[in-house]
Amino acid sequence: TYDAKYGAKMSGYNSSESKTYPNEDWFITPALDLTGKSAATLIFNHAFGPAASVPNTDATKAQYTIWVSNDFDKDVKEATWTELKGMVYGTTGWGYVSSGDIAIPAENLKANCRIAWKYVCNDVSATWEIKEVIVK
């Protein structure tokens, strides 16, 4: 969902039931036209919460990933996605950090470029908040 205070927010937590449900969420940008660009970088601010859900192992970091595609239409399972590596992870609950500069591969520098944040929630309450997204 989008919230002016938080930006994009993905979570498996249902506050009315005080329960977390395992799920897979995708937050996908509108189509970007990167035709003619020789390079492009993604930067954003993000936070994880609560503190117990901050990714600090390879297994927990695998729950929070970034992807790029040029053939996404309506179904994430039918698109060809390439994982973007190099994201900086925060170390405290709800502490916003910069993702760092994440390079978009040259083969994706064309029309219909979509960037996606994929969050795989287990049965532990956790939220990923993303804001101030820039592609330059």
Describe each region flagged by the PLM.
Residues 74-108:
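Extracellular carbohydrate recognition and processing domains
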